[in-house]
A protein has these predicted regions:
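Solenoidal tandem-repeat scaffolds enriched in leucines and small polar residues
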Residues: 1-13, 17
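Solenoid-like repeat scaffolds
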Residues: 15-25, 52-61, 85-96, 119-130, ...
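"A position-specific structural signal for the A-helix of alpha-solenoid helical repeats
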Residues: 32-33, 67-69, 76, 99-100, ...
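Long, ordered, amphipathic alpha-helical scaffolds
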Residues: 98-185
């Protein structure tokens, strides 16, 4: 539905999907995805309500998504102290946060730090494959309003000379006429 440009219907579907049980319990993954989308459409209060309603018994990755939602939502609400707490958690757990610390750096417009972080991930044998995939250009859906500036900054960081030098040392970045799995990047 999002690929068809119908954000409202997509949100309604995600809300409905979040009501189903998952493995006998709360449908955590769908509810976290909904909370991320709520930050993307600039609904920070709803995003916090959704994310906090899940509870704290999450996988490490689930907790990372929850902390990302808190960071983004508190930033949108102007509560920078709470946003910084969530960002500190993302930084401390970057190995399991699957790029959410990078997203926080981009949201903060900390482009030098984002470039250094990206270079570090390119140089890491543990993170290189996922990082190389992240710098490829695919056919994507348009960015949600809350994601657009961060997405623009991402490509600005990828285009930097220092990042390109690190990238070219271990791989390459190219554009492909293949539809991406779901992200706006």
């Amino acid at each position: 539905q999002r690929r068809l440009g119908d954000i409202e219907t997509a949100m309604a579907t995600m809300t409905f999907a979040g009501r189903f049980s998952e493995g006998g319990g709360s449908n955590v993954s769908q509810r976290l995805n909904l909370a991320v989308w709520q930050t993307g459409i600039l609904q920070p209060r709803q995003a916090l309500e959704t994310a906090n309603g899940i509870g704290d018994n999450l996988s490490p990755y689930g907790e990372a998504v929850q902390q990302w939602v808190r960071f983004a939502a508190y930033r949108q609400l102007g509560d920078l102290a709470r946003a910084e707490q969530a960002k500190a958690w993302l930084q401390a757990h970057d190995d399991v946060a699957a790029g959410y610390f990078m997203e926080a750096l981009l949201e903060d417009n900390a482009l030098d730090a984002a470039a250094a972080h990206l270079i570090g991930r390119l140089q890491s044998t543990q993170h290189r494959s996922d990082t190389l995939l992240s710098v490829q250009r695919f056919v994507t859906v348009p960015s949600l309003p809350g994601d657009a500036e961060r997405d623009r900054r991402w490509w600005q960081v990828v285009a930097r000379r220092d990042v390109q030098a690190a990238l070219n040392a271990v791989g390459r970045s190219d554009a492909y006429a293949i539809v991406a799995r779901g992200s706006s990047r």
